[in-house]
């Protein structure tokens, strides 16, 4: 069997990390990279940590030049956070008859906020015989799929609290902007009031995924709250900077109600360089049920590595999947791939033979 052929679209913090990870793996190769601006015409190896060595070069190109019909088995789409912004790119890729894994947060469960676009993506994917998945560390695993997994050992579930205390330091400029890193408290509050500050993108998706997975019908729209985390020391991450007195993070909560009762709560304070101020990161799944569940992982699963690994490790599942739009609750569970990618892929499902 030919190696699994991968195109990466977007070579920022996440896309570049996926390239580095793929280059360490067996049975898979990067056959194209899509970029823009000054990146066009440069070598992929100019933008990632892995040296080229004796590998064949991969030149960054425009979408129309790199993504041609059946040019790869999958495109890792590492741009955008919102389904509506990612839609045209997804449409372009699936119409070239290539599978898609998107790191856009809303794509983890697009039916939560964009049901019509989700139906259209599903239709386009089926029409072209390919599959589409959105995943990442969160949404995609920690605050939703992991929670769902832990309900599997419960006879009854009365309520759920999913908490993630994490560092934003690995993430790129798009996330820094969404979280308001470096702005003043006044600018943050104005952004919240005007709806221009996204904060964490994914509560609707995580709550919707959990509710649908275990059979709860939400009785009211999902709500969320958003508060600034103000730093008293200067903090600098690879892609963000917050001077003392400004915003270094965003504390968000999300709430899902069933029959008027709070059943699913999300608690998600995240900031750059939390260790500078003694904040202990961690992931927590707290289920009030039969039995009670109190799962703790501390420090947190790092968001950057986690998102990179989730997207790369789901490649076999999306290639093998039936055509259409998928989510993490209808595909085989993610797992590390320590052997050859080809061993996990059905030959008839492979696009590049």
UniProtKB/Swiss-Prot annotation:
Top-rank taxon: Bacteria
The EC designation for this entry is: 1.4.1.12
Q: How is its activity regulated?
A: Inhibited by p-chloromercuribenzoate, iodoacetate and N-ethylmaleimide.
Any one GO BP annotation for this protein: ornithine metabolic process
- Return the InterPro entries for the record: DAP_DH_C, Gfo/Idh/MocA-like_OxRdtase_N, NAD(P)-bd_dom_sf
What GO molecular function terms would the record report?
2,4-diaminopentanoate dehydrogenase activity; nucleotide binding
Catalysed transformations (reactions): (2R,4S)-2,4-diaminopentanoate + NAD(+) + H2O = (2R)-2-amino-4-oxopentanoate + NH4(+) + NADH + H(+); (2R,4S)-2,4-diaminopentanoate + NADP(+) + H2O = (2R)-2-amino-4-oxopentanoate + NH4(+) + NADPH + H(+)
Keywords carried by this UniProt record: NAD, NADP, Oxidoreductase
Query: Coiled-coil regions in this chain?
Result: none
Fetch the Pfam families from UniProt. Answer: DAP_DH_C (PF19328), GFO_IDH_MocA (PF01408)
Q: Please explain the role this protein plays, according to its UniProt record.
A: Involved in the ornithine fermentation pathway. Catalyzes the oxidative deamination of (2R,4S)-2,4-diaminopentanoate (DAP) to yield 2-amino-4-ketopentanoate (AKP).
Which protein family is named in the record? Answer: Belongs to the DapB family.
Assembly, per entry: Homodimer.
Report the protein name in the record.
2,4-diaminopentanoate dehydrogenase
Species source reads: Acetoanaerobium sticklandii (strain ATCC 12662 / DSM 519 / JCM 1433 / CCUG 9281 / NCIMB 10654 / HF) (Clostridium sticklandii)
Recorded name of the encoding gene: ord
């Amino acid at each position: 069997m030919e190696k699994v052929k991968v195109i990466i679209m977007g070579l920022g913090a996440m896309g570049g990390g996926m390239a580095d990870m793929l280059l360490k793996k067996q049975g898979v190769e990067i056959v194209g990279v899509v970029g823009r601006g000054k990146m066009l015409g440069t070598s992929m190896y100019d933008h990632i940590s892995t040296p080229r060595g004796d590998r064949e070069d991969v030149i960054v190109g425009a979408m129309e030049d790199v993504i041609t019909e059946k040019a790869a088995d999958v495109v890792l789409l590492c741009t955008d956070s919102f389904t509506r912004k990612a839609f045209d790119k997804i449409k372009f890729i699936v119409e070239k008859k290539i599978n898609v894994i998107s790191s856009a947060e809303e794509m983890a469960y697009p039916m939560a906020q964009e049901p019509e676009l989700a139906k259209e993506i599903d239709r386009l994917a089926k029409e072209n015989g390919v599959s589409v998945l959105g995943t990442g560390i969160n949404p995609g695993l920690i605050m939703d799929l992991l929670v769902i997994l832990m309900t599997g050992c419960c006879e009854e579930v009365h309520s759920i609290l999913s908490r993630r205390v994490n560092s934003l330091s690995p993430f790129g400029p798009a996330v820094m902007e969404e979280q308001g890193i470096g702005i003043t408290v006044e600018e943050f509050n104005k952004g919240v009031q005007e709806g221009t500050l996204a904060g964490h993108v994914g509560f609707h998706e995580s709550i919707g995924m959990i509710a649908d997975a275990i059979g709860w019908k939400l009785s009211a729209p999902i709500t969320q709250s958003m508060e600034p985390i103000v730093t008293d020391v200067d903090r600098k991450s690879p892609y963000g900077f917050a001077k003392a007195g400004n915003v270094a993070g965003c504390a968000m909560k999300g709430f899902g109600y069933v029959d008027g009762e709070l059943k699913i709560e999300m608690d998600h304070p995240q900031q750059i360089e939390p260790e500078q101020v003694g904040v202990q990161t961690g992931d927590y799944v707290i289920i009030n049920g039969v039995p009670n569940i109190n799962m703790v992982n501390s420090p947190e699963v790092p968001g950057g590595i986690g998102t990179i690994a989730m997207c790369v490790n789901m490649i076999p599942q999306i290639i093998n999947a039936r055509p259409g739009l998928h989510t993490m609750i209808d595909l085989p569970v993610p797992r590390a791939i320590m052997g050859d990618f080809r061993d996990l892929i059905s030959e008839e499902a492979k696009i590049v033979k």
